[in-house]
Swiss-Prot record:
KW Coiled coil (keyword) present: no
One of the record's GO molecular function terms: proton-transporting ATP synthase activity, rotational mechanism
Chain ranges passing through the membrane: 29-49, 87-107, 117-137, 146-166, 188-208, 211-231
A GO-annotated cellular component: plasma membrane
Function: Key component of the proton channel; it plays a direct role in the translocation of protons across the membrane.
Name the UniProt record assigns to this protein: ATP synthase subunit a
Gene3D superfamilies, A to Z: ATP synthase, F0 complex, subunit A
Keyword Translocase on entry: no
Pfam families: ATP-synt_A
Topology of this chain in the membrane: Multi-pass membrane protein
Subunit comment: F-type ATPases have 2 components, CF(1) - the catalytic core - and CF(0) - the membrane proton channel. CF(1) has five subunits: alpha(3), beta(3), gamma(1), delta(1), epsilon(1). CF(0) has three main subunits: a(1), b(2) and c(9-12). The alpha and beta chains form an alternating ring which encloses part of the gamma chain. CF(1) is attached to CF(0) by a central stalk formed by the gamma and epsilon chains, while a peripheral stalk is formed by the delta and b chains.
Length: 252
């Protein structure tokens, strides 16, 4: 148990809460699944409770909800134009899910679902899948113009087209790894400094004095992680908007 408290990786372990095995497939309900459900419930409850009154003079919480709505709406309009607003429910849902999941992960003993690559990759595949499906539905084979930039000489197409295809295919990887790596690294660093504080404090008066610097670093890192939680949600959402713009306007 003592090792678990110091081990910075222990916080990312998947724990089976309700073992479920169907046809040889492990479909157990885990701590990761629990906090994904909690993330959806918290985000939905916050938005419902803060906007249900629809007061002409909004309170603080209602103002936060309206600011989040306008923030994402403006982001989507800037990246994909007014046509992009048809994707607002998707982008806003992704933004709120990533933001709330990141924030919940900062609470002690809570699980950070966005620190697992399988979760972030699933979100990225949802985005890229939407781009591909909508792109072909709207433009047919014209969607393939996305891989043929305008103004490129014909002789260069042999080189440019494969590069564009590889760039497109790598999008879900870069989108998911960026979020996963930032959350993983931040939480490990925070856990390490917190472990220093606990370990030094157990050494008596000298240890307590020596723990002041790690404690200050832990507090500063916590504040930084709050900023990172928002920035990563913003980056994920803004890149989603840019990718959706390719589905709307595949011609460069």
């Amino acid at each position: 148990m003592a090792a678990d408290k110091v081990d910075p990786i222990h916080q990312f372990h998947i724990i089976k809460l309700v073992p479920i095995n169907i046809g040889g497939y492990d479909l157990s309900f885990t701590n990761s699944a629990l906090f994904m459900v909690a993330t959806v419930v918290v985000a939905a409850a916050f938005l419902f409770l803060t906007t249900s009154s629809r007061s002409l003079v909004p309170g603080r919480l209602q103002s936060i909800s309206e600011m989040a709505y306008e923030f994402v709406a403006n982001m989507l309009r800037d990246a994909a134009g007014t046509q992009g607003m048809k994707f607002f429910p998707l982008v806003f849902s992704l933004f709120m899910f990533v933001l709330v999941a990141n924030l919940l992960g900062l609470f002690p003993y809570f699980f950070t679902v966005t620190s697992h690559i399988i979760v972030t990759f699933g979100l990225a595949i949802l985005v890229i899948g939407t781009v591909i499906v909508y792109g072909f539905m709207k433009h047919g084979l014209g969607f393939l113009k996305l891989f043929v930039p305008k103004g490129v000489p014909l002789v260069m197409m042999v080189l440019v087209v494969p590069i564009e295809v590889i760039s497109f295919v790598s999008r879900p990887i870069s989108l998911s790894v960026r979020l996963f790596a930032n959350m993983l690294a931040g939480h490990i660093t925070l856990k390490v400094f917190s472990g220093f504080v606990v370990s030094l404090s157990a050494l008596g008066a000298v240890g307590v004095a020596g723990s002041i610097l790690p404690l200050a670093m832990a507090v500063a890192l916590t504040a930084l992680e709050l900023l990172v939680a928002f920035l990563q949600a913003y980056v994920f959402a803004v890149l989603t908007c840019m990718y959706l713009n390719d589905a709307l306007h595949p011609s460069h």
